[in-house]
Each structure stands twice: as C-alpha cells, then as structure tokens.
C-alpha cells in the first residue's frame, strides 16, 4: 500500500500507527488530528521509532484535510472516548458530527479510498459512514470483532493455561453488551472448548468478553483500551494492504445475510486487496440466531436514534 491516513491522533490512532509504521504496512503514513501540532509530534515520534526498527515507512502528521489526498485507506479513530460508567452509545451525540466532518473531507480529497471506522459507537458510525459515502459495503466497514475475539482468546488462555496461539474464537453482532460469542466455534488445538471448560466457566468468559472494554476503562480510570485496538487495526490493514484474503470479523453492512438488511453488524468477512471482498454467512442454531437477532434489534434502535439527531 502506498499511502494510509489515520484520522485521530489519540491513543488508539497512535498505537495503530506505531505497528503500521514498524511493520512497514504502507510506504507513507499520515497521522491527522484537529490538534495539528499534536499529530505532528506523535508522527515524528512514531517515524523515529520505525526507523530504529529498520522500517522505511515515511510518517508525517498535521491537521489539514488536504493531507488525505492520495490515501488508499483511511482509518477513522477520531472522537471522544467513553468515560467510566458510559456506554459506547453515550458518546454518539459528540462523535457523530466529528465523523460527518471527516467523511466530508474524505469525499472531497480521497473519494476512492477504503474507509475503516474504529470510533465508537462503531456499529452506528460505520453505518453512517457508509450511508454518506456513496460507496459500496466493500469500501466502508468497521473494526470491532478482531478486538472482541482477541479478548475472548485472552480470557480462554487465562482460564485453561493453554497457549493463545492454539485458540480459535469467533464473536458476532454488535460491539457491546449484546455481542454474540459463538462458543461452538471456539476450539483449542482443534478440540472443542467444552472439552476443557464447564458451561459455567464458558459463560463467565462470555460475560467478561462482553464487558472487556469496560473492565479496562474502569481499571485505567483516565483512558480506554488502546494497545489491543491498535493491534486489531494493524491486522486489518495488513490483510487489505497485502491482499491476504484473510477471514476476519468486521462491522459490515448486511444485505440479507443472517436475515438482516440495512444494518451494520459484526460478522466474519474476507478482507482482500480492495477492502471487504465478501461476508461469510455461517449457519446458526436457534439459540444463536435468537441472540444475533437480539443484538441486531439493539443496533437497529441505535441507528434509529442516530438518524433522529
């Protein structure tokens, strides 16, 4: 990939930039923020760290929308993070106009760019970004499931003592309390998770995964998760930039899959050279479909709330 722009030089944007630059996932990396000097300073720091790691990625920062020009991929991390006790939906009224402004700049300066939305509430903002972009769902989608899956794998490894490398997991649905971890798809070394853990232990992991972001927020007090989201972003950037055809969970616009349309939900997708190549529709049993429908209904209500603002 030639040029990638991260809009939002906060902790998540900076964490993603560090990995993207270090791993040379693009030739030119731009870190944009309304606080231009902050973006410049962080970009310079990231660039120097990347150089020390042997990377030739050129990193620069600033506030001007013109910096978007030529971007093949734009990652949106800008917005206010939630505070302890807040839900992701609580920051919608603040982050919606921020997203709208960014999308207007993208349409003007980088109209063909692929857009990856990370800002919360990510399901609603992904839907908004897609609806105003004029692009197909292959060009506008969000990041949530890669992070949620990593959290689940972490908790499974902690509970079982097995290497996280051998753990596979999958989370669908909205990014929040209504997410749908598909436990029958969770395995350790190709062995079903139920072979190692009781149903009570598995349910504890499910609940902790749903509350994973809030747990970190409550412990840190002054900031939300940043490092794990940064890694999740970098994974998706790598899949797109290097055309890896990876199957990763993403917040995608559904077109009839899982019985839903006109909604943005976390589902397994194929990420390829130009973006989201396709949505994978898994067969769900009655209980899983009911949980997915519950999650979808919540996201639909959130989208309706967004439209009313």
Swiss-Prot record:
Among HAMAP family, the record links this protein to: Malate_dehydrog_3 (MF_00487)
Q: Which Pfam families match?
A: Ldh_1_C (PF02866), Ldh_1_N (PF00056)
Enumerate the Gene Ontology biological process terms: lactate metabolic process; tricarboxylic acid cycle
Protein keywords: NAD, Oxidoreductase, Tricarboxylic acid cycle
Q: Does the keyword Oxidoreductase apply?
A: yes
Q: What is its EC number?
A: 1.1.1.37
The lineage's top-level taxon is: Bacteria
Judged by the first EC level, this protein's enzyme class is oxidoreductase
Q: Which reaction does it catalyse?
A: (S)-malate + NAD(+) = oxaloacetate + NADH + H(+)
PANTHER family the UniProt entry points to: L-2-HYDROXYCARBOXYLATE DEHYDROGENASE (NAD(P)(+)), L-LACTATE DEHYDROGENASE
Q: Which GO terms describe its molecular function?
A: L-lactate dehydrogenase activity; L-malate dehydrogenase (NAD+) activity
* Role description: Catalyzes the reversible oxidation of malate to oxaloacetate.
Q: What is this protein called?
A: Malate dehydrogenase
The active-site annotation reads 175
Q: Provide the binding site for NAD(+).
A: 8-13, 33, 95, 118-120
For this chain, the family text in UniProt reads:
Belongs to the LDH/MDH superfamily. MDH type 3 family.
User: What species does this protein belong to?
Assistant: Pseudomonas putida (strain ATCC 700007 / DSM 6899 / JCM 31910 / BCRC 17059 / LMG 24140 / F1)
Residues holding substrate? 82, 88, 120, 151
Q: Which gene encodes it?
A: mdh
Is NAD one of the keywords? yes
